[in-house]
Amino acid sequence: LNYGIFLDNSYQSDFNFGASNDRFSSFGAHGGEMDYYFFYHSKLADIINSYTFLTGRMELPPLWSLGYQQNRYSYYPETEVFRIAQTLREKKIPADGITLDIHYMDAYKLFTWNKNRFPNPAAMNKKLKDMGFRTTVIVDPGIKIEEGYGAYERGIKDDIFIKYPDGKNYAGEVW
């Protein structure tokens, strides 16, 4: 018997497909609506097709993103990034991406580049792409509190930061 069940419920759910008794199966949720869908087909591929027809089919990610990504804390300056990329190519180690950690930033401010370590990010990225690499930069969910820093100033102006119950902007440590 080939079937699939989709329980459309955000509450804690329990599924028992023969764990305690191989003649008994059950599923349920601790609240909410019991909206469920039952799929039956002779082929597993058809069950998955019916399920994704209902829930949607995601786009495939770019092929390069599924390949090996060279990453560590942290590659800098730009010459070190190129050295790593060249070494991977010389040793014929397959790699599709290189990730830059926090040291690419200017004083750890998101959406900025440290121009001493990475004087021309666009040219660096082009050269890496010509070598067959895609560049990914780390983006942490924190905006540095610093007068004159564009992202911080815009956040204050547009009043978009998370607030404490007393209305003051939330501040926390990222690193």
Which residue stretches match the model-derived regions?
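Short acidic, glycine/serine/threonine-rich loops at helix termini
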Residues: 17-19, 109-112, 146-153
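Short, solvent-exposed turn/loop segments enriched in Gly/Ser/Thr/Pro and often Arg
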Residues: 98-104, 139-147
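Short, solvent-exposed loop/turn segments at the edges of secondary structure
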Residues: 31-33, 63, 106, 155-157, ...
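Conserved short loop/turn motifs at secondary-structure junctions
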Residues: 68-75, 100-117
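Aromatic/His-enriched, Gly/Pro-containing loop or helix-boundary segments
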Residues: 106-121, 165-175
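Carbohydrate-recognition beta-sandwich/jelly-roll modules
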Residues: 1-95, 122-135, 139-140
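Active-site groove signature of glycoside hydrolases
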Residues: 96-101, 171-175
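Active-site-adjacent "subsite" loops/lids of carbohydrate-active enzymes
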Residues: 141-175
